[in-house]
């Protein structure tokens, strides 16, 4: 019975991998949620627009989302902006 419980626990870990956003990705998500464009984000963070786009792609890939509303939902449900 203990082995079965361990197997179920291990499957849950695989089914729900931990999503870790970098500090910079968290900054960008917050600005995206605030409605800033890539250009506005790049100006605010003193980075290029292409760097912002790279971070956005990584954020969407990590969260397995493809739209801002889905990203906002994932961020809220998984508490991804916690420090």
What kind of region is each of these model predictions?
Residues 3-30:
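Regulatory hinge/linker segments at domain boundaries
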Residues 25-27, 42, 74:
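A generic structural micro-environment signature
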Residues 35-70:
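Recognition helix of helix-turn-helix DNA-binding domains
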Residues 69-73, 77:
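Long hydrophobic alpha-helical segments typical of transmembrane helices together
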Residues 32-36, 75:
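Short helix-to-turn junction characteristic of helix-turn-helix DNA-binding domains
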Residues 1-4, 44:
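C-terminal output helix
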Residues 78-83:
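…primarily DNA-binding HTH/wHTH and HhH modules…
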């Amino acid at each position: 019975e203990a082995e079965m419980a361990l197997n179920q626990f291990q499957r849950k870990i695989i089914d729900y991998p931990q999503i870790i956003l970098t500090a910079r990705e968290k900054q960008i998500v917050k600005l995206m949620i605030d409605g800033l464009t890539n250009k506005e984000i790049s100006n605010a963070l003193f980075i290029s627009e292409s760097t912002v786009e790279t971070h956005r792609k990584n954020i969407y890939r990590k969260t397995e989302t493809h739209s801002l509303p889905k990203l906002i939902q994932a961020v809220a449900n998984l508490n991804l902006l916690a420090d």
